[in-house]
């Protein structure tokens, strides 16, 4: 039974284009199934390594043990609180990174002299090791969620500002001249040309920074957290509870994949709307 989308494609595309779209769908399905098979194969091989004693359980943990611990911790809701705290801190850090970066990059574009003045300082700050500012932030603000959120911001904000600013100033000058010729001002040039033209790159930068925000939050939880997955990792290392440590790392990987997938979905929706305009 044909779907509405398939009926629309029959009206809009030629046979060659339809064949190309079909091949792309098949390729996408093959990639998805390959990932699933590789993941299952890795887990099976990992577990068999413990079953046949190829891996020393004193230094590592098995998928079965991690799964049992995960279900046990879910029952008393303690794990969900830690996951929720890390997720909340990461999302807030990411939103603050994107918001402040967009504001400052826009300001630098409207005031080129200001942008040239601050650019070398941003480069220096972005070149610092990602965990270098965290101890200083803890001294200033103490421990707590606000400190961890600021640690999350410090990892990605300087690079995000620089990248956005570079994208803005690399806008095709001929298009800007066209706006000026038609009597448009600098604000209209930004809203009609610069920002819309930079939106795909902006979304790509955002996808990168969601991972950086998560890294910064985990660093903050290592040093100043009393809740969160970073705190669980440090606690598991201190008491040599490897099941807890590895489970926390696996959950972090799942959170990173989820956030990246959500941003990719948002990116596709925006691109479809732009193409339909």
Provide a role label for each language-model segment:
Residues 1-37, 261-277:
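Transmembrane alpha-helical segments of polytopic membrane transport and secretion proteins
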Residues 75-107:
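Transmembrane alpha-helix signature in integral membrane proteins
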Residues 81-89, 131, 139-160, 198, ...:
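Loop-to-helix entry region at the N-terminal start of transmembrane alpha-helices
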Residues 103-138, 162-169, 177:
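Cytoplasmic-entry segments and transmembrane alpha-helices of multi-pass inner-membrane transporters
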Residues 112, 169, 204, 246-277:
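C-terminal transmembrane helix and the adjacent membrane-cytosol boundary/short C-terminal tail
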Residues 139-140, 215-252, 275-277:
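Glycine-rich helix-loop "coupling/hinge" segments at transmembrane-helix boundaries
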Residues 150-154, 187-220:
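Transmembrane alpha-helices
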């Amino acid at each position: 039974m044909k779907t509405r989308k398939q009926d629309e494609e029959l009206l809009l595309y030629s046979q060659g284009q339809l064949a190309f779209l079909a091949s792309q769908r098949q390729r996408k399905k093959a990639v998805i199934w390959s990932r699933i098979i590789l993941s299952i194969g890795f887990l099976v091989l990992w577990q068999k390594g413990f079953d046949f004693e190829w891996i020393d359980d004193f230094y590592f943990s098995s998928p079965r043990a991690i799964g049992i611990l995960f279900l046990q911790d879910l029952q008393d809701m303690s794990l969900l609180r830690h996951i929720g705290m890390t997720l909340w801190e990461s999302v807030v850090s990411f939103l603050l990174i994107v918001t402040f970066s967009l504001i400052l990059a826009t300001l630098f574009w409207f005031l080129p002299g200001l942008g040239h003045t601050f650019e070398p300082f941003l480069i220096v700050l972005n070149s610092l090791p990602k965990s270098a500012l965290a101890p200083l932030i803890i001294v200033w603000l103490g421990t707590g969620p606000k400190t961890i959120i600021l640690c999350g911001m410090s990892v990605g904000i300087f690079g995000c500002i620089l990248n956005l600013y570079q994208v803005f100033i690399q806008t095709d000058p001929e298009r800007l001249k066209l706006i000026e010729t038609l009597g448009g001002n600098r604000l209209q040039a930004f809203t009609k040309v610069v920002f819309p033209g930079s939106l795909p790159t902006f979304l790509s930068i955002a996808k990168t920074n969601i991972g950086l925000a998560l890294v910064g939050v985990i660093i903050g939880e290592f040093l100043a957290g009393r809740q969160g997955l970073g705190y669980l990792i440090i606690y598991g290392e201190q008491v040599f509870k490897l099941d807890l440590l590895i489970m926390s790392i696996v959950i972090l990987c799942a959170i990173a994949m989820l956030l990246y997938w959500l941003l990719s979905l948002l990116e596709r929706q925006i691109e479809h709307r732009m193409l339909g305009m």
